[in-house]
Amino acid sequence: MSDVSYREITAKGLWSNNPALVQLLGLCPLLAVSSSVVNALGLGIATLLVLVISNSFVSLIRRQVSDAVRLPAFVMIIASAVTCTELLMKAFTYELYQILGLFIPLIVTNCAVLGRADAFASKNKLIPSAVDGFMMGLGFMLVLVAVGAVRELLGTGHLFGDMHLIFGEGARSWQLNIFGADYPNVIFALLPPGAFIVVGMLIAAKNSIDAHLKKRADARKTAVSTGSKRVRTTGAVS
């Protein structure tokens, strides 16, 4: 694939076809787990790993699997990737794994993962498929972290609490107390309805930016079209 194609894959994963903000996939973990940055980052990294692994293996076997058993084969690959990721989390971030709980195995049912395997990896070579999985996973993780940051800030008044669950004891000092000890915690932000509102605001912001960019692009096209139609006239007109 050309560089232009890789740029397109990146743009789609991070923005124009973002699994959370555009496709609205994976909303269950997005709403349930994103109560803090550390939870969101943990689930986001796990989902990213599963996407890269599953896309890569689906691409490798795409010509050996018939259409009749395509989807069951993809689900088995995804389940294997989730199991490997789950074992890694148990080994290195056990406390975070206990907090995320059931939502790690539920990555198997995330439509974003199966959708990329079927729509992209089963039709493309290994490297583009791995890049697609990485970018889609990164786009999903960034939305998770953004939602988690807003909810944690509004709900507790601080950011980056409990980051030692991922990065070790040295990360305990990363916590930023933004609003101070007297901040009246907005508990609503930590509940699922608060997550719905934050996600809705992010979707609205993205749609507003897209509309603004489209308006500017249309205005630029109109200006170019008008300029090309101008005709210079010289001499007297009788």
Curated annotation (Swiss-Prot):
Q: What class of enzyme is it?
A: translocase
Look up the signal peptide feature and give its range: none
Q: Which InterPro entries match?
A: NqrDE/RnfAE, RnfE
Keywords from the named record:
Cell inner membrane, Cell membrane, Electron transport, Membrane, Translocase, Transmembrane, Transmembrane helix, Transport
Look up keyword Lyase and say if it applies: no
EC number(s) recorded for this UniProt protein: 7.-.-.-
Which residue spans traverse the membrane?
Answer: 20-40, 41-61, 72-92, 95-115, 130-150, 185-205
Membrane topology qualifier:
Multi-pass membrane protein
Q: Which coarse location class applies to the principal site listed for this UniProt protein? A: membrane
Q: Does the keyword Methyltransferase apply?
A: no
Q: What subcellular compartments does it reside in?
A: Cell inner membrane
Q: Which GO terms describe its cellular component?
A: plasma membrane
Per its database record, what is this protein's job?
A: Part of a membrane-bound complex that couples electron transfer with translocation of ions across the membrane.
Q: What is this protein called?
A: Ion-translocating oxidoreductase complex subunit E
Q: Which organism is it from?
A: Cellvibrio japonicus (strain Ueda107)
